[in-house]
Regions:
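Hydrophobic beta-strand residues in large extracellular and virion-surface proteins
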Residues: 4-8, 25, 29, 100
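Conserved short hydrophobic interaction patches
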Residues: 28, 32-36
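Short, mixed-charge low-complexity intrinsically disordered segments
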Residues: 35-107
Length: 107
């Protein structure tokens, strides 16, 4: 039986969650990344997406979706794209990393 695992390492501590669906794992990953980045509203999302490395980028660029209700209505394929865009904003901080893996339940 396939399952998906969301794994995260933050400040040397590891945690993981298991999910029956790929979409569930991606949603958990996006939620964790958004929490790590401190995104709670539209203003936070724009600031983080356009000014994460201390260099203000194009302020007219809209950030990827972050509203949990809207994310839940998307497909796994759409969510992977959003996850990729947000997780890229964590790459400058070597204290945080996360990954989604598919595995099987062994008997």
């Amino acid at each position: 039986m396939p399952i998906w695992v969301f794994m995260v390492r933050y400040d040397g501590e590891m945690a993981c969650s298991t999910h029956f669906t790929e979409k569930g794992a991606i949603l958990a990953a996006i939620e964790d990344v958004l929490q790590y980045l401190g995104i709670e509203d539209d203003e936070d999302a724009k600031k983080v997406y356009n000014d994460r490395s201390g260099i203000e980028e194009d302020a007219a660029v809209e950030p990827p979706e972050w509203h949990h209700e809207k994310l839940r209505k998307m497909t796994a394929g759409e969510l992977y794209g959003i996850f990729g865009e947000w997780v890229e904003k964590t790459w400058d901080d070597f204290m945080y990393e996360c990954e989604i893996l598919k595995t099987k339940v062994a008997a």
